[in-house]
C-alpha cells in the first residue's frame, strides 16, 4: 500500500511539472507572420488588432515601433500587436498618400513595450524610419518612378528581397541609423548618403548611369558587388567606404580627414580620379 502511495505521489509531481512547463511555454511564445517572428513581452498580455487603411504611396514609422511590410496589390490593411492598454495610442493613419505609424502620446518618461505592426499594402515610393523605429521589407519591390529610403536617430530599414527602381534610388542614413539590403537593387541612378555614425550595407547594386556616395562623420558604407557606369565617392571625417567587387567605366574619389576608401577590387574600364588629403587612405584598382 505504501509503495502505491509513493508511486501516486511521484506521478502527481511529474504531471504538475509538465503542466508548469507547458504553461510557461505558452506565455513566452511569440507569434509569427509568414515565418517573420513578432517578438512580444512575456510580462504583458499582447493583443492583436486588424485595421483597414486606405491606399498609400509613402510610409513613415516613428518611436518604438517595428514594422514588417509586405507589398501587395490586394486591399491594404495592417495588423497591430501590442499590450491592450496602449493599443488605442498607436495610430495607423493615411493622410495625403502617406501612411504614418506612430504613438499619439509620447510624453517624456512614459514607458511602454515596442509595438509590432504588419503592413499589407501597395508599392511605396518612400519609406522612412526615425527615432529607433524599424521597417523590414518582406517582398519584391518594383517601383515605377523613384524610390527613397531614409533613416535617422538609431532607426533601421532592411530589405530582404530584390528591389527594382525604374527611376532614381535615394538612400539616406543619419545619426546612428542603418539601412541594409540582402539581395539586389537595380536603378537608373543612385544617390546614397551616410552621416553621423550611420551605416549602409548592400549585397548587390546595379545602376545604369551614375552612382554617387557621400559618407561622412565616422559612418560606414559597404557594397559587396556594384555595377555602375560612373562611381563617384566623397568620404570625410573618419568614414569608410568599401566596395568588395564590381565594375565601372569611371571612378572619382574625394577622400579627406582620416577617411578610408577601398575600390581596389572593382574593375574599372576607364578614367580614375583621386583627390585625398589630411590622412585619408585610398585603395584603388591598379
What are these regions (language model features)?
Residues 1-286:
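Intrinsically disordered, low-complexity terminal regions
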Amino acid at each position: 500500500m505504501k509503495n502505491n502511495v509513493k508511486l501516486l505521489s511521484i506521478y502527481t509531481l511529474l504531471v504538475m511539472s509538465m503542466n508548469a512547463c507547458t504553461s510557461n511555454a505558452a506565455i513566452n511564445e511569440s507569434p509569427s507572420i509568414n515565418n517573420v517572428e513578432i517578438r512580444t513581452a512575456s510580462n504583458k498580455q499582447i493583443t492583436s488588432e486588424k485595421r483597414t487603411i486606405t491606399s498609400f504611396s509613402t510610409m513613415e514609422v516613428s518611436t518604438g515601433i517595428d514594422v514588417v511590410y509586405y507589398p501587395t496589390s490586394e486591399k491594404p490593411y495592417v495588423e497591430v500587436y501590442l499590450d491592450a492598454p496602449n493599443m488605442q495610442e498607436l495610430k495607423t493613419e493615411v493622410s495625403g498618400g502617406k501612411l504614418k505609424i506612430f504613438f499619439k502620446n509620447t510624453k517624456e518618461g512614459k514607458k511602454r513595450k515596442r509595438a509590432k505592426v504588419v503592413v499589407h499594402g501597395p508599392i511605396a515610393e518612400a519609406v522612412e524610419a526615425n527615432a529607433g523605429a524599424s521597417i523590414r521589407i518582406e517582398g519584391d519591390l518594383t517601383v515605377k518612378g523613384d524610390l527613397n529610403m531614409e533613416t535617422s536617430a538609431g532607426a533601421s530599414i532592411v530589405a530582404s528581397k530584390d528591389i527594382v527602381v525604374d527611376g532614381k534610388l535615394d538612400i539616406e542614413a543619419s545619426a546612428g541609423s542603418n539601412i541594409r539590403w540582402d539581395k539586389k537593387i537595380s536603378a537608373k541612378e543612385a544617390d546614397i548618403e551616410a552621416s553621423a555614425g550611420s551605416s549602409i550595407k548592400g549585397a548587390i547594386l546595379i545602376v545604369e548611369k551614375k552612382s554617387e556616395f557621400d559618407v561622412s562623420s565616422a559612418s560606414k558604407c559597404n557594397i559587396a558587388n556594384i555595377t555602375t557606369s560612373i562611381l563617384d565617392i566623397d568620404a570625410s571625417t573618419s568614414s569608410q567606404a568599401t566596395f568588395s567587387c564590381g565594375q565601372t567605366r569611371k571612378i572619382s574619389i574625394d577622400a579627406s580627414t582620416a577617411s578610408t576608401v577601398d575600390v581596389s577590387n572593382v574593375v574599372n574600364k576607364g578614367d580614375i580620379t583621386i583627390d585625398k588629403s589630411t590622412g585619408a587612405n585610398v585603395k584603388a584598382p591598379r
